């Protein structure tokens, strides 16, 4: 789904756009020939952030149930506190200065970086969220965002599958023309 993007539209506009579209599809699932019990969210990188935050928003509304979250190398912590943010800060495609710039463009001010809807990894509780499939790349600044989120989901009793993509960098699902390893990602999704 397209949603309005930062920097022109800062948080919460992109999230609200996505959630509004998700809710419309969910509430009108039969019109689209979709089983309402199987409406899932997913995304990669910033899109995975929006998908995870959508799950947090939906759990506040008993009439809406996200069936699954599919997250590819999710950026889930605007404070960039994970060790991988420093370990892979440069030389692996997505660098630390780009991450800082993107987060700064997304939020109105620094304090929002601690908001669970900006940084789902920092949300107070992950209980009641949908099952998750999370892909993380070995050489990626946000690798530990995905790993820590998966761990927190499991601790909250959420069925979670974590896939570690050895030798891959951020953006791996878009690299099928470059490496056959990227193609295996799609076969894992279908399982």
Predicted segments with their positions:
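Alpha/beta-hydrolase superfamily serine-hydrolase fold, recognizing
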Residues: 1-191
